[in-house]
């Protein structure tokens, strides 16, 4: 048999407090932009999604709490090999082989007596550009967003009045006609104390939509 306390709890209309089974903050629905919505990964956080798309979640500098990138052994070894393969200035001074001098650099050979340049050896060694100079890359998603923004910025959206606003304007017009000064001083209908010019602009637009002359 259950205790008196348990029976009272079962009869009570107040639900007991239960633990959240799912973190609702992770279920972010992106409705404002179709491109971001199409490329959104629901298994990642907002910060991780923005970083993956090449965007920033905050325009200002982060105050802390950033997720640290954990490098794998393969990435660490690749970095070490890359740093070891870099040509130092001291190495260039000791060689006369163009294949050992990076492209875009040169070695100047001077005369020991006059210190004049007698020979210039231009480097021919190809050097791969550092792709890690910037964390944010101009991905295809960013290109799509730029095209979308450029396309939609040229569209001029006309503001439409709500049903409640239409009823309010209709009441003003039926009561005062085109007398906007009386509309302005109407304390019951013009609760927001809008000016005669503002009321004229709204009524004119409302009359145009409803084909009233």
UniProtKB/Swiss-Prot annotation:
GO biological process, one term: rRNA processing
Main function: Involved in the biogenesis of the 60S ribosomal subunit.
Record's GO cellular component terms: nucleolus; preribosome, large subunit precursor
Pfam families attached to this UniProt entry: Nop16
Protein name in UniProt: Nucleolar protein 16
Ranges of biased composition (kind: Basic residues): 1-23
Subunit structure: Component of the pre-66S ribosomal particle.
Gene: NOP16
Transmembrane segments: none
Keyword annotations: Nucleus, Ribonucleoprotein, Ribosome biogenesis, rRNA processing
Keyword Nucleus assigned: yes
Compartments reported by the entry: Nucleus, Nucleolus
Region (Disordered): 1-25
Organism: Scheffersomyces stipitis (strain ATCC 58785 / CBS 6054 / NBRC 10063 / NRRL Y-11545)
Taxonomic path: Eukaryota, Fungi, Dikarya, Ascomycota, Saccharomycotina
Family: Belongs to the NOP16 family.
Main location (coarse class): nucleus
């Amino acid at each position: 048999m259950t205790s008196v306390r348990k029976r009272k709890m079962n009869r009570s209309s107040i639900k007991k407090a239960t633990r959240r089974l799912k973190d609702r903050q992770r279920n972010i629905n992106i409705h404002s932009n179709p491109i971001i919505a199409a490329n959104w990964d629901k298994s990642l956080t907002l910060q991780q999604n923005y970083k993956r798309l090449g965007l920033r979640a905050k325009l200002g500098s982060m105050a802390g709490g950033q997720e640290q990138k954990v490098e794998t052994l393969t990435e660490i070894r690749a970095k070490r090999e890359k740093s070891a393969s870099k040509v130092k200035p001291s190495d260039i001074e000791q060689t006369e082989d163009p294949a050992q001098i990076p492209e875009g650099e040169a070695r100047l050979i001077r005369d020991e007596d006059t210190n004049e340049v007698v020979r210039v050896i231009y480097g021919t060694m190809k050097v791969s550009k550092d792709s890690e100079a910037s964390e944010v890359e101009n991905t295809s998603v960013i290109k799509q967003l730029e095209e979308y923004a450029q396309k939609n910025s040229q569209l001029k959206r006309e503001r439409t009045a709500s049903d409640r606003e239409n009823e309010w304007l209709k009441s003003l017009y039926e009561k005062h006609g085109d007398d906007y000064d009386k509309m302005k001083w109407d304390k019951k209908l013009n609760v927001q104390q809008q000016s005669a010019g503002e009321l004229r602009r709204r009524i004119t637009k409302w009359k145009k939509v409803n084909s009233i002359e």
